[in-house]
Amino acid sequence: MNSGHPYLFHDEFYSFLNSIDEKVIPIINHDKQDNHNTNNNHYNRKTDYAKRNQSSSKKPNHAAATANQNWEEVRTMFKPTTIEKSNEEGIDKWMQDIRTSINKITSKKYEVQFQNIMNSLKKCMEMEGIDESQRNANIKLIANFIFNIASTNKFYAELYANLYGELTQSYSIFQEILQTFLSTYVSSVKEIHYIDPDVNYEGYCNYIKQNDVRKATALFITYLVKRKVIPVIRLLNIIVAFQDISKQYIEEENRVNEVDEITEILFLFLHEGKTIFQDCKGEWIWKFVILPNIETMSKYKKGDKKSLSTRTIFKYMDMISEIGD
């Protein structure tokens, strides 16, 4: 048979039937007739059903009407609830508006969003019906709110440092919050305690999260130094304090992870603040404390100290390259 020509298939098939024994042909013809009758019966049933359906469609469908009515009632009952945003002025609205503006800040939209933030701060300071104490409490709450956002975002650290630097020029509370934070920043590094994920996975995740926050804050501080919001000597003192903690930890057992994390922060200071430190190489604290500590750590070998990893040693070698360029 030629499968590529369906009509040839048809002719060949019936030629084949002609060659079948005559006793078989009547049986086939009989089956054809039965199929024909069956199809006619099926067609008649469909026709009768269509007529009945057409007839019944002329009658009012009370059940369908009732169902539609019930559905409309359900739709009315479960209409989506629309929550309207409150336009009432107050600290909650100002903080919400400020968060929105901070989230929208980009290099191109900086001025517009900065002005929106300043407008919210102005409303806070000029709000009527509250005393001076409450007004100061409100602005302090908002300032802390802004600081927490700005100091914990690694990707926008430079942009947020610019924002915070400008705010310190308009409201002294921002500088006060910054100085309070810096006074406790070094001691916060002592809170780094490694957690084994096999023992406490949730605790380990929090440990990683806190380390990321510390790194973001390190960048934020460095950019504030570049903007001269924080004096260079303040950052140099922070670096020395971190180095002292590292020197203590490498002599203790099971401090490898803590030393690694502190080293990462030190590297961020030196890498992002490279231009700053180029200008202060004559400073006594840099020349006789910071630089010798870096050189000493870079020359150690694994096993020289109880809690000194190859990772940390290599990172100090990278620091040598950074400050030597």
Feature locations, PLM:
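Alpha-helix N-cap/helix-initiation sites
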Residues: 132-139, 153-157, 228, 232, ...
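Charged, surface-exposed interaction regions in soluble eukaryotic proteins
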Residues: 248, 253-257, 278-281
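Long, low-complexity, intrinsically disordered regions
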Residues: 1-140, 171-197, 261-325
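HEAT-repeat alpha-solenoid elements in large eukaryotic scaffold proteins
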Residues: 212-221, 239, 259-276
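Amphipathic alpha-helical interface segments within eukaryotic helical scaffold
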Residues: 147-150, 154-250
